[in-house]
Amino acid sequence: MRKPKITVIGGGTGSPVILKSLREKDVEIAAIVTVADDGGSSGELRKNMQQLTPPGDLRNVLVAMSDMPKFYEKVFQYRFSEDAGAFAGHPLGNLIIAGLSEMQGSTYNAMQLLSKFFHTTGKIYPSSDHPLTLHAVFQDGTEVAGESHIVDHRGIIDNVYVTNALNDDTPLASRRVVQTILESDMIVLGPGSLFTSILPNIVIKEIGRALLETKAEIAYVCNIMTQRGETEHFTDSDHVEVLHRHLGRPFIDTVLVNIEKVPQEYMNSNRFDEYLVQVEHDFVGLCKQVSRVISSNFLRLENGGAFHDGDLIVDELMRIIQVKK
């Protein structure tokens, strides 16, 4: 019997949570990862290697999908100290991806090589072969370019789009990305930052078109917390409305939302300064936009913060896959 094909689209720290749990299931996995990050280590590397697609999100996905020994993972994720000169703040894995990207001619080729080297379960694709610049248009008409600048701007985002960071060419999807979406049985969006992790992938026209054309079940894992500079005062229904608006029509079939209350002591704005309050649940609003709403306890409290429990999310995804067979 053919294994179900599940593709996860996103970036940041959210997608790896789902991918890590999917590895334990009898499915074929693919990850499509944003290349619009311009902050931190990825941003510094982009300045020095203009052809490089930012490696940070790809690095985290690679670790999540790999069966590398724990020590290898610690080496790959090791971040140089602040007194390490030009290397300060860079994870070793980012430098390895950057070096292999240059050696292999592209980040796409580098990820295929690293996937073999670290025995990943599934395929990893950058959403585009070229670094992208994310642009946000705010409701007051202001436009801000660059992911790191967008989150610092005070205002309500109306829409986002991406441009090729190297030239005026239209951003194109990376090799095999469109085919992977069209051949999938399920597409999972999120969890992750709505405007800076998920949308930078799907506003690439080829990817957006593929999502509208695919026969796959499309599931969106809504964030647990609102995010400063992105989704302040958002309900879960608002998140879905934004996604649908960017592609011009509804395309999400299922939404998974956490309804377990986050204890006040886990809303640590000092440690997790981008998070504000728990996303408000709007069941009626969701039902108007999608055919299936799964409201449950998907909460994992860890290290002083509120996160998704990947195993609980994936269990629900597998139930949907079984029903669709």
From Swiss-Prot:
A biological process from GO: regulation of cell shape
InterPro entries registered for this protein in UniProt: CofD (IPR002882), CofD-like_dom_sf (IPR038136), Gluconeogen_factor (IPR010119)
Entry's Gene Ontology cellular component terms: cytoplasm
Taxonomic superkingdom: Bacteria
Keyword Cytoplasm: yes
Localization annotation: Cytoplasm
Keyword annotations of the record: Cytoplasm
UniProt-listed Gene3D superfamilies: CofD-like domains (3.40.50.10680)
Family: Belongs to the gluconeogenesis factor family.
Protein's recorded name: Putative gluconeogenesis factor
Source organism of this protein record: Streptococcus pneumoniae serotype 4 (strain ATCC BAA-334 / TIGR4)
